[in-house]
């Protein structure tokens, strides 16, 4: 991965869909992220947070508007500038720097929380990047990780094609270049389609002492379906059932504690 200063088509598509979304429309997503982190750790004004891959910057901006401390790192100069404009329109500095997670020095034991919200699918050397994240977390620090799930029937990366994530990498790349142009390989391509089993193993190998998945994080108080509640109870009792259910989820979601 490299930082590209020229205009890229995937960034333009992203901005055309998301740049004008009001911050108020992201409040539910913001609260859900805080809820997931809060499942394993408290958050207050002294909590040092970093978001990798900020997009339009809505999460760090909402943090600052709510008295929380969150820096951001984004590889796209266009998106950094977009976040700056949105922050200024709300009277704050978005606090987002241009950087490449594959190369950036995140420091040693600097952060209480690091958020990687649908970004690692785009990180070519993702294992090296995860090691940097692990080193940058303080003891008992928290990583919130959300990304692709290879065996999802519909992938958010390319929803037009069912079973897109099941395709071998070279074929996926060709499909995306056919529809979105060759510069998708500069920024926007999903180099990685993850699985729950594979990520769980990777997080534990890195040294995370606690790895919590989407089943654990489910907001059970808001689930009305008896079938869904029953399925969650089965997942609690059987690791086999849990892995079978998670296999086809649309995304992978983990909260990991160092």
Describe each PLM feature range.
Residues 1-109, 113, 117, 130, ...:
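Conserved N-terminal segment of class I S-adenosyl-L-methionine
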Residues 59, 154-159, 222-227:
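Short aromatic-enriched loop/helix-cap "lid" or pocket-rim segments at secondary-structure transitions
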Residues 70, 143-144:
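A short hydrophobic/small-residue beta-strand
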Residues 118-122:
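Short catalytic micro-motifs in class I SAM-dependent methyltransferases
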Residues 125-126, 156:
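Conserved catalytic-core motifs of eukaryotic protein kinase domains, centered on the activation segment
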Residues 127-142:
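A short glycine-rich, Lys/Arg-flanked "PGG" loop and its adjoining helix->strand segment in the class I
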Residues 144-173:
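Conserved class I S-adenosyl-L-methionine
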Residues 179-180, 185-258:
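A C-terminal cap/extension of S-adenosyl-L-methionine-dependent methyltransferases
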